[in-house]
Regions:
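Polybasic/polar functional segments that serve as interface/processing modules
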Residues: 1-91
Length: 91
């Protein structure tokens, strides 16, 4: 397996096992969200985002997809809730 950081074009041309290897060994985990029967992990690698779709009941990774669009982060950011009043009044 190549140790080089792939471009998004190269990553998208890889087979499933090669994509998984780069996710496990090179990508940075950012956040996870649930979507119906899936747990969707978001990773960052070499200027692009990777979504890993893990099917919970089948215990299987169904899809690994990459995009350069930061809009993919939006669905994950909707999950974050900040209690700004609690933070501001904690002192």
């Amino acid at each position: 397996m190549s140790q080089e950081m792939p471009s998004i074009d190269h990553f998208n041309q890889m087979n499933f096992d090669e994509k998984a290897w780069h996710v496990w060994h090179k990508a940075t985990f950012l956040i996870v969200r649930n979507s119906r029967n899936y747990r969707v992990n978001l990773y960052y690698l070499n200027g692009f985002y990777i979504q890993l779709w893990y099917h919970i009941t089948r215990n299987k990774i169904d899809r690994i997809s990459a995009t350069e669009s930061p809009r993919v982060v939006d669905t994950f950011l909707k999950m974050i809730e900040l209690d700004l009043d609690g933070i501001m009044n904690s002192n």
